[in-house]
Amino acid sequence: MPTNFAAIVPGKNQSLVVQEAPYPTAGENRIVVRVHALAVNAVDYATQMMGETLFPWVTYPLVLGEDIAGEVVAIGPGVTRFKPGDRVVGHAVGTNSNNSAEGAFQQYVVLLENMASPLPHALEYQQAAVVPLAFSTAIVGLFQKDYLGLQIPSLTPTRTGKTLLIWGGATSVGCNAIQLAVAAGYEVITTCSPHNFDLVKSLGATAVFDYKKPSIRDDLREAFRGKTCAGALAIAGVVPQTRNEAAEACLNLVAESEGDKFVALSMPAPPNVPDGVSCKFIFASTVKDNEVSHQLYGYLGEALAHGSFIAAPEAEVVGTGLEAVQGALNALKQGVSAKKLVVTLP
């Protein structure tokens, strides 16, 4: 049996420590994956710093991390989509389950079968690792029935005649959401900084606006004139003012437009929600427990192989080995735009 090492959080607000960890076994409907690349996310350093203050169920020591790409080394009972040797990309849910065996920051990790997709050989592990958490966040907000409940994507989509607002199109979640919504038959209007306009248009957005312009709300209102709104997905960073502005702009746009009156939020709802409009905070790991993960992680493998879904944003490899993960988290705290920080494992 191989030796497993992990970058472990020993306690709240403590730096990661690389040490030997138990070698995981594949339980029912689960696979064990040898990690070749992992990405870091804001939720990782937030959990590291805040622990049970952020997620009451968190106990230490704990292996954090959500995004991995690697090779299947074992499958558990009931697994039908994968076999040892398969290349995969997947969402590790250890933070949600408080189970270190399911955390990404280690050499061997357990994934749920329905939270993983086959990875075509043309796509490198390090680029694939940017996808999972952002993908899960997007599919919860877009397709779960208790959120926007949009039509499911297809390689041959049927146009719905509806237009969706995605605030934060150049974020990791936004890059996934634009592609998914277009593949589901929706027109997408989005926002980002001007230097990322070409990126979001290449992913399928038909119109894009600078979210920093004082006229942004008027610009969006005019863009949606005469269109049927499918609702909105509001994605923003960790700065409270930016998050509030994003939520309020989306809520007001939906309230003033014809069509669906729902906004999926990556931030807490603001205090004043317009009458007739509903909104809900997105918690990505909820998708593991419903049919949307089965449908969409199945679709992801097909779309990656077909070339109709691109692993975006760009991966920036900031180190090799588990010892580099803490540095990646520190770098992420300083702010990143239109890229995702990745660590490769030898």
From Swiss-Prot:
Molecular function GO labels: nucleotide binding; oxidoreductase activity, acting on NAD(P)H
Induction: Expression is under the control of the azaphilone cluster-specific transcription factor azaR.
Binding site for substrate: 133-140, 269-273
Cross-referenced InterPro entries: ADH-like_C (IPR013149), ADH-like_N (IPR013154), GroES-like_sf (IPR011032), NAD(P)-bd_dom_sf (IPR036291), PKS_ER (IPR020843), Trans-enoyl_RdTase-like (IPR047122)
Pathway: Secondary metabolite biosynthesis
Keywords linked to the UniProt accession: NADP, Nucleotide-binding, Oxidoreductase
Matching Gene3D superfamilies: Medium-chain alcohol dehydrogenases, catalytic domain (3.90.180.10), NAD(P)-binding Rossmann-like Domain (3.40.50.720)
Signal peptide: none
Domain of life: Eukaryota
EC numbers, comma separated: 1.-.-.-
UniProt: NADP(+) binding residues: 43-48, 170-173, 193-196, 211, 251-252, 336-337
Record's function text: Dehydrogenase; part of the gene cluster that mediates the biosynthesis of azaphilones, a class of fungal metabolites characterized by a highly oxygenated pyrano-quinone bicyclic core and exhibiting a broad range of bioactivities. In the first step, the non-reducing polyketide synthase azaA forms the hexaketide precursor from successive condensations of five malonyl-CoA units, presumably with a simple acetyl-CoA starter unit. The reactive polyketide chain then undergoes a PT-mediated C2-C7 cyclization to afford the aromatic ring and is eventually released as an aldehyde through the R-domain.
Record family assignment: Belongs to the zinc-containing alcohol dehydrogenase family.
Name by which UniProt lists this protein: Dehydrogenase azaJ
Organism of provenance: Aspergillus niger (strain ATCC 1015 / CBS 113.46 / FGSC A1144 / LSHB Ac4 / NCTC 3858a / NRRL 328 / USDA 3528.7)
